Amino acid sequence: MRIIEQKPTLIVLMGLQASGKTTFFERYLRDRGYVHINLDTLKTRNREILEVTRCLDQSLDCVIDNTNPTKDDRRRYIRPAKDKGYHIIGYFMQSKLAGCLERNDRRERQVPKKGILATFNKIEMPSLEEGFDELNFVSIEDGEFSISKWIEDEI
């Protein structure tokens, strides 16, 4: 009998502030045992790096819940996870700017509008070439998420 070893998983969430990333994590991933890594919660990049390193060293499944708008932002997680043999899945939140601004206005802790606009202006669409094993679009309508497979030719 041959036992198949399952790779640990790194999930990288991508999208504007108030696009639904944390809600998506809470609804679909928290109860599956993923470690939640969020710069807003950890407060400093150093703490975030320590937590990512801990997860990778212990082969823990984890979710990076940050805006991750650029390839460089995503590379800081993908490269070391690939080196540790992780399966890497990306979820790109397809929220419209107007929808994010509206949701942000309803938040208790609001992000300044100029911060959301700055993130919007630097978004680079992800690609499988970055090292993702899987990429998905996530849309949100009336508080419900819809997930579809990434098709690079349609971007």
At which residue positions do the language-model features occur?
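Amphipathic helical hotspot of TIR/SEFIR-family domains
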Residues: K71-I89
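Short, basic, helix/turn surface patches
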Residues: I64-K71, G90-F92, K114-P126
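Conserved substrate/cofactor phosphate-moiety recognition/catalytic segment
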Residues: M14, S19-R75
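Conserved GTP-binding G-domain of TRAFAC-class P-loop NTPases and closely related GTPase folds
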Residues: M1-M14, S19, R27, D31, ...
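Conserved catalytic network of the ASCE P-loop NTPase/AAA+ motor domain
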Residues: R54-D57, D83-K84, E129
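A general structural motif
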Residues: Q6-P8, S59, G85
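Conserved phosphate-donor/acceptor-positioning beta-strand/loop module used by diverse small-molecule
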Residues: K84-L101
